[in-house]
Amino acid sequence: MNSYDKTTPESVIQSDLILMVSKIFATDLTIWRNNTGAAFDREGRMIKFGVKGQADISGIMKPLGTRIEIEVKRPGGKQRPEQKQYGQMIKDHGGVYLLCDGDIIKQVIEPLRERLERDRKVIR
C-alpha cells in the first residue's frame, strides 16, 4: 500500500488508483482518466473541455453497466461545490461516486467490491 501526503501530486494517486482497480477488477470494470481543461483557438478564444465538476476518473462496471466516477484529491484536499453537485447527480441516477484522498483500498476498492456484489445479486 502506498503512502501519500499533502505533497503527493493528484496525478500520482490517480495513476496508482487506476492500476490497482484495473488489476483487481480486470474483468468487471473498465476505468479511464478524464482529461479536462482549456485551450485557445487560433483566434485567441478559449475552448473548454469536459464537464464542469466532472470527476477525475470515470468507468463502467458489469453486470448492469453501472456508471463509476472517482474524484481524486491529495490528502486533506477539498471538493469544489461543482464537484459535489456532479457527484450528487451521478448518485441520483444510480451511479457510484467516490472521493479518494489517498486511501485507495478503503475509499475505492471496498465500495466497488460491495457494489459489484450487490449488482450481481440483482441479476441472479
Pin down the residues of each PLM region:
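Catalytic phosphate/metal-binding cores of nucleic-acid and nucleotide-processing enzymes, i.e., regions
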Residues: 1-124
